[in-house]
């Protein structure tokens, strides 16, 4: 039996040297089954497992070899290397210490000694950055740690957790799923998967994952905190929505504001809460605050079409037509619908109208002013700004008053004529078409002759 086992080992060595590690593994296993008390066979198979990156199995074999032969130096070397690859700093240090006790001048683990020191420093740096929520730094330093300890599931999952906090949920999920394939009962992996669901606005499934992690590990504090946060956020969002639907807008505003304080990292949820609060602001007349909320939504998610359309509407209501046009143009790039095309067309028309003279404003009347109100307004303003009243003023003041007098006449000429007024209200550029030869003095004389007779006269109060 021993002879056959030795032959198996030799064949295994040949396959190992040829880098046929799977074949070598089978041959070493055959040798072990024939001679289970050989520390060397376990040592060889441990080396083979290491080449296959199966550090857990390699560590098991190396430790078994040590139990069979406590003076087996190579086995301790392999334990140190495996512990280092698995991120077990204490295990690696103990193995290195034993090797040096067996052979004080041994150069076998010089690199590993340096790597252990570096890994310990990296762990401290990672923890400090994690505590201050500097998650990008954590990922950076964990990448360095994983170069030393590539099989450390703890490092992988902590990196995945931080990636989730950074919104890189696809990457985080890939890591978590990979770990779960190795260990389906990993509470940390299930926790990370729950985080990814939570940060992609799937609170219900997130809660289920946190509860599953707690079933596997009742003391899993992160899952406890996240389950509580999920439930609180879900409840507050639903409460805010209920208050909004029932018209209790100011109460809804308070709830949405409080909900936004729960987790600044949850961009998907916060963008919805901000959009909902923006809607509330429009209902209570706080259009500028609504725009600020929409700005924050679009900073979190530039593709959030509803926020873009709401901001455009607020700009339009505030007569900030250029901003409204810009928003509708961006919205049209995201979704080319007939409704958005119509909104853009209307905004451009409103912008064009806004650049014309505002005859209602010039006369100081409302847009629904009656014919009599328009006449009274013209009479009052024409008398105030008539050039004769300012004959003794400076040249600059006379010029200014003449311009105002002319504009007042133009305004009255349009608003007192039903056809022209209708065209003006519809947005047509009447000024260019019909006002080119307008004479404000003729308008003034005609008005007062019509109002007071052929010999009507008036006196200015200087």
Feature map (PLM): residue ranges:
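Residue-level recognition of tetratricopeptide repeat
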Residues: 4, 38, 55, 72, ...
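TPR alpha-solenoid repeat register
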Residues: 41, 75, 108-109, 155, ...
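Short "pre-J" leader segments immediately N-terminal to J/J-like domains in DnaJ-family
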Residues: 199-233, 243, 248-254, 283-292, ...
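J-domain (Hsp40/DnaJ) module recognition
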Residues: 241, 323-368, 387-462
């Amino acid at each position: 039996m021993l002879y056959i086992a030795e032959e198996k080992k030799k064949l295994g060595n040949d396959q190992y040297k040829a880098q046929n590690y799977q074949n070598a593994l089978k041959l070493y296993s055959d040798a072990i089954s024939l001679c289970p008390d050989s520390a060397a066979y376990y040592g060889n198979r441990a080396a083979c497992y290491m080449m296959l990156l199966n550090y857990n199995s390699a560590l098991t074999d190396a430790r078994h070899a040590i139990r069979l032969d406590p003076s087996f130096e190579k086995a301790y070397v392999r334990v140190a290397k495996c512990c280092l690859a698995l991120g077990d700093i204490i295990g690696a240090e103990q193995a290195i210490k034993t090797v040096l006790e067996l052979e004080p001048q041994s150069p076998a683990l010089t690199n590993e000694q340096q790597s252990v020191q570096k890994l310990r420093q990296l762990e401290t740096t990672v923890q400090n950055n994690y505590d201050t929520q500097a998650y990008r730094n954590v990922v950076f330093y964990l990448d360095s740690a994983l170069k030393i300890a590539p099989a450390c599931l703890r490092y992988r999952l902590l990196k995945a957790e931080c990636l989730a906090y950074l919104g890189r949920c696809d990457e985080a999920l890939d890591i978590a799923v990979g770990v779960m394939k190795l260990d389906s009962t990993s509470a940390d992996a299930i926790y990370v998967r729950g985080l990814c669901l939570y940060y992609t606005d799937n609170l219900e499934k997130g809660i289920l994952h946190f509860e599953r992690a707690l079933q596997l590990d009742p003391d899993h504090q992160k899952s406890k905190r996240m389950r509580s946060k999920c439930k609180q956020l879900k409840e507050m969002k639903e409460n805010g929505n209920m208050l909004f639907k029932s018209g209790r807008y100011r109460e809804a505003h308070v709830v949405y504001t409080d909900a936004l304080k729960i987790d600044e990292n949850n961009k998907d949820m916060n963008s919805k809460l901000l959009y909902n609060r923006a809607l509330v602001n429009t209902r209570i007349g706080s259009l500028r605050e609504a725009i600020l909320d929409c700005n924050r939504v679009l900073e979190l998610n530039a593709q959030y079409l509803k926020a873009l359309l709401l901001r455009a509407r607020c700009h339009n209501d505030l007569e900030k037509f250029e901003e409204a046009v810009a928003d509708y143009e961006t919205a049209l790039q995201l979704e080319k619908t007939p409704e958005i095309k119509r909104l853009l067309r209307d905004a451009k028309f409103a912008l064009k109208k806004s650049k014309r003279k505002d005859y209602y404003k010039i006369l100081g009347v409302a847009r629904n002013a009656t014919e009599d109100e328009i006449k009274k307004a013209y009479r009052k303003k024409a008398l105030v700004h008539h050039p004769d009243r300012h004959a003794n003023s400076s040249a600059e003041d006379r010029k200014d008053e003449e311009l105002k007098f002319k504009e007042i006449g133009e305004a009255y000429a349009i608003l007192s004529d039903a056809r022209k007024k209708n065209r003006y209200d519809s947005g047509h550029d009447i000024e260019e078409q019909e006002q080119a030869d307008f004479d404000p003095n003729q308008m003034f004389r005609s008005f007062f002759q019509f109002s007071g007779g052929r010999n009507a006269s008036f006196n200015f109060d200087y």
